[in-house]
Amino acid sequence: MSVKIRLKRMGSKKRPFYRIVVADSRSPRDGRFIETVGTYNPLTDPETVTLKEEKVMNWLNNGAQPSDTVRNILSRNGVMKKFHEAKFSKK
């Protein structure tokens, strides 16, 4: 089972709001997911992001692959830097 961290679209028509979820890569975009680890609202200025960093780090350490958009969101919030530092400091 390949696990991805990706966006799940919520909200109404023309007013998107996203949940950052951990899901099996074979499940549909808005379908079944394993866990919610944050939210992303691109309509606010500046865009609003909330993350459960411990859960995100746990999933990344267990091999979950973030989508390109989620990788950018995590990078802007410093999570990817912490992940890489933790990963390479062990060696």
From Swiss-Prot:
One of the GO BP terms on file: translation
This protein's UniProt keywords: Ribonucleoprotein, Ribosomal protein
Pfam families according to UniProt: Ribosomal_S16
Cysteines joined through disulfide linkages: none
Cellular component aspect of the GO annotation: cytoplasm; small ribosomal subunit
Alphabetized GO MF terms: structural constituent of ribosome
Stated family: Belongs to the bacterial ribosomal protein bS16 family.
The name this protein goes by in its record: Small ribosomal subunit protein bS16
The organism's taxonomic lineage, starting at the top: Bacteria, Bacillati, Bacillota, Bacilli, Lactobacillales
Recorded name of the encoding gene: rpsP
